[in-house]
Amino acid sequence: GAIAAFTSDAWRPQILTGDLTVAMCYSADANEVIREDPNLDYALPTSGSSLWMDTLVIPITAPNPAGAYAWINFMLRPDVAARICERLSFATPNREAYNLLPPEVKNNTSLFPSESALERCEGLIPLPEANAIYDRYWTKLSSG
């Protein structure tokens, strides 16, 4: 096998046409592609993976903090959070929203991995002292 590309989305058409047999991707993207081709599957490496989350924040300089709070509160409504989870394939930490999800979404292990799978995963933290090293090797890797 060979490395086909280092991009965030070039794998999509390649895996759907069969030009790739494996790709590293975000779980939400994998779910989207699996909806197009149910013969594909998502696997979390047995060694684990990185954990990530999207967050909503309000900058201290926000021109309309009240509007920002209203938006966040809207996004946190269980019915809205459940729809976001279903439509975008992003897991929700909102327990009330989770309870509104259909069984096929609740049982989707790419959205809601088992506790044992999560124990093998870890969050990513910034390592400013390593940025120059990462940048040097990434440039070497991605430039061929």
Locations of regions flagged by a protein language model:
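Conserved C-terminal helix/tail region of periplasmic/extracytoplasmic solute-binding proteins
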Residues: 115-144
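Ligand-binding pocket segment of bilobal, Venus flytrap-like solute-binding proteins
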Residues: 1-45
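Non-transmembrane alpha-helical segments in soluble domains
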Residues: 12, 16, 24, 69-76, ...
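Short amphipathic alpha-helical segments
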Residues: 54-56
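Mature extracytoplasmic/periplasmic domains
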Residues: 50, 59-119
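Sec/Tat-exported extracytoplasmic proteins
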Residues: 1, 19, 34-37, 60, ...
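Extracytoplasmic/periplasmic, Sec-exported soluble proteins
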Residues: 3, 7, 50, 59-63, ...
